[in-house]
Amino acid sequence: MTFEELRAEAQGCLACNLSSRRTNVVFGEGNILSPLVLIGEGPGDTEDKTGRPFVGKAGQLLDKALAEAGIERSSVYITNTVKCRAADWSTGRPMNRAPTEEETLACRRWLVPQLGLIKPKVILCIGAPSAKNLIKKNFMITKERGQYFPSEFAKTAIATLHPAYILRQQNISGDGGFSLLVADIQKAWEAAQRLVEKDAMGKADKMVIEAEEQGTLF
């Protein structure tokens, strides 16, 4: 299955109850050849309306952090562990809520092949829920952000603070953790680039060895 075929199939997903109230499936966007994938928890109201990940206030702060790190948004791939908005409708007006474990598990049918097709070198988990889903269940974001962890979907994974959390903290103090977000993005990007270079060198060495074995190098 191609990436676009997977995206098209996801648009009709009925695997959990989030499908009944969604406006759009927010599959993800960006460079599918990127060595770095950013993964949040799930779309909010603005994302549900537009079908694009991280385009609300938190997304705008993420864009600012990417720019501060010297990285164009279009050069990475951005998605979420859950592709549909999770909302509480009990008051008649939808309010964002955390996806349930069942909803998150249901969406792995899209996330796992999505990452399998992209084949990123590094995954940057945006926020604690993403890290708990993709790194380890007892992940502690304030203590373990910015560190390298093994990943079943990439060479390594790093987690950082969620822009929504930073926005809340900025109401209390100026930086609110924004500088940490920028630093973690830079670290993840630089690690991804190093891994790309390492793979390229490995392939070049392999080609030299094969050429020598075949007597065609000189």
Q: What spans do the regions from the language model cover?
A:
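A polyanion-binding, active-site-adjacent surface
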Residues: 1-218
